[in-house]
Amino acid sequence: MQQATAPKISFVSLGCPKALVDSERIITRLRAEGYELARKHDGADLVIVNTCGFLDSAKQESLAAIGEAMATNGKVIVTGCMGAEPEQIEAAYPGVLSITGPQQYESVLEAVHRARPALHNPHLDLVPPQGVRLTPRHYAYLKISEGCNNRCSFCIIPKLRGDLVSRPAGDVLREAEKLVAAGVKELLVISQDTSAYGVDVKYAESPWKDRAVRAKFLDLASELGELGAWVRLHYVYPYPHVDEVIGLMADGKVLPYLDIPFQHASPDVLKLMKRPAAQDKTLDRIKRWREQCPDLALRSTFIVGFPGETERDFEFLLEWLDEAEIDRLGAFKYEPVAGAPSNALPDQIADEVKQERWNRLMARQQAISARRLKRKVGTRQQVIIDEIGPTVAKGRSKADAPDIDGAVYLSSRRPLRVGEIVTAKIDRADAYDLHGTVAGF
């Protein structure tokens, strides 16, 4: 008798690293139950689309992905942030099998079971102990909480993902330990508000090895720094207690890197945005951080053309950037999001003004980036290898997160391996990237 084949699932993951972690969790459960992953929609038994609903452009991308899955397969399960408001999906594609919001893993699995039951009962040893990941083997995203307590006027994340829910520190550390044991060299700590970690549970302790660890930003970062991997901190709001973690960076416990979404510098615009920690002494703090940890790299995102942003506000931002010298910057032109309070603000900015300001901001940042990278020429930097090319290898320094920051291009007389961390001599720099040779050869 011919043995039945395992059902195959095609998976599309859209949006931010938090959504990617959600996708990894769903896939890990499916693999544990005997489902296989298909590379293409046609030939798969089902397609799961994990959507993004943060911006209208992201919603359009999600709808396009659903449409492609419906056209090439026809059996589609939708989950993720856009699924929290299913009306638009239902109107465009009434034939989808199921629609669920973010973090609703059990509902997704139930929908899969209804549409295509597994062949046998789950056995957890069918998957590796670290689970199934969608990133390269040498780095992994480590999500420490869900949701957000902030109510920024341009954001609907709390509406989609709820208020802050922190994971117990012991659970986070056990996951991190498994990842490192499986060969992960870099842990990228993510959440909606990493520096607020533990506020919702009043920094409750949980067991970890032979001791109790508080669910607190500093405590967790300190423990992660003992696992022997690079630890990179993302989505950190500039609350006063962030100052405490700079010492860990100066001591080499965690990477000297902070991803802080400042969004703007003008006090008036920050007030309209309803940003937390919107204080006017941020420049002083950045100066103190760099005095304590000279190698500190700062990444941030900014919004230009926010309703009410005047030319004076924008010039303030440019002058602030000149003084702050942010190492890595992402900029977005303000885009109305359905359900966001900022839609009702007066003095909306014309699209051509948004574009003009975005161009000026990026030109200013390009000069800042080139200036800061030039200072690294002649120095030695640790570099983690991401790709091996025919003539050079592509990697990242401690100042570069994957996908969003710059790269280091290296020549080497010996073969290099993906995931290897090497010491490189920096020979030259351009606006966003470094070029060098592996030291010692």
UniProtKB/Swiss-Prot annotation:
Location in the cell: Cytoplasm
Q: Which gene encodes it?
A: rimO
Entry protein name: Ribosomal protein uS12 methylthiotransferase RimO
Q: Which residues take part in binding [4Fe-4S] cluster 2?
A: 148, 152, 155
Tell me if Disulfide bond is a UniProt keyword of this record. Answer: no
Q: What is its EC number?
A: 2.8.4.4
Limits of the MTTase N-terminal domain: 7-117
Positions that bind [4Fe-4S] cluster 1: 16, 52, 81
Q: How is the cofactor bound?
A: Binds 2 [4Fe-4S] clusters. One cluster is coordinated with 3 cysteines and an exchangeable S-adenosyl-L-methionine.
Please tell me the species this chain comes from: Rhodopseudomonas palustris (strain ATCC BAA-98 / CGA009)
